[in-house]
Amino acid sequence: MKNRILRPALLCVAALFATTAQADAGHDHGSAHAGAHAHDADTPYGRPGDAAKAQRTVRVVMSDTMRFDPATITVRRGETVRFVAANGGRIEHEFVLGTTASLKAHAQEMRAMPDMQHADPGAVRVAAGASGEIVWQFTKAGSFEFACLIPGHFEAGMVGKVVVR
């Protein structure tokens, strides 16, 4: 009798945990960013680039003063750039490409889920003293941004600009 009740109860609990884990597995960026950060799709600011076709490397240093160096980067339309995001600070930082609107929306999402991990070719989270890399092809002219979206960093002004000519 005990087994007839215990076994279905355990199966229900196991199914609940599996469903919760499955639902959480895709939360890397949440629904607000699914279209803006599709892995191989064009975005308003370009698309993931092929590392073998990178025309240059731009090193961007992230600091605990909540700044990027350089703060403005100019690229040519069609250019594929390898960004090396170097964390010169003692705390974790991010380098996330986007539009002003997408970065603001993502920053709000990050405040709700600060431990969110990025599964996005236009974003990299970098531990203190480490470096990360993004390869991006800028397909459209315009002015775009990069930012650190860890809660408090974006709000403190950790935003840079990419000008595509």
UniProtKB/Swiss-Prot annotation:
Residues 25-50 are annotated as: Disordered. It comes from the Bacteria. Changing residue 113 to S: Loss of activity, cannot restore copper tolerance in a deletion mutant. Keywords: Copper, Metal-binding, Periplasm, Signal. Disruption phenotype: When exposed to copper, the deletion mutant shows reduced growth under both aerobic and anaerobic photosynthetic conditions. Mutant is extremely sensitive to copper under anaerobic photosynthetic conditions. Mutants lacking this gene are more susceptible to copper than the Cu(+) ATPase copA mutant under microaerobic and anaerobic photosynthetic conditions. Periplasmic copper accumulation in the deletion mutant affects periplasmic and membrane c-type cytochromes. Residues 1-23 form the signal peptide. SUPFAM superfamilies: Cupredoxins (SSF49503). InterPro entries: BlueCu_1 (IPR000923), Cu-binding_ET (IPR050845), Cu_oxidase_CS (IPR033138), Cupredoxin (IPR008972). Changing residue 27 to S: Does not affect activity. Cu(2+) binds at residues 93, 148, 153, 158. GO terms for molecular function: copper ion binding; electron transfer activity. Residues 25-42 have a biased composition (Basic and acidic residues). Is a green cupredoxin able to bind a maximum of three Cu(2+) ions: a green copper site (CuT1.5), a type 2 copper binding site (T2) located in the N-terminal region, and a third site with a yet unidentified location. Monomer. This is Copper-resistant cuproprotein CopI. The gene is copI.
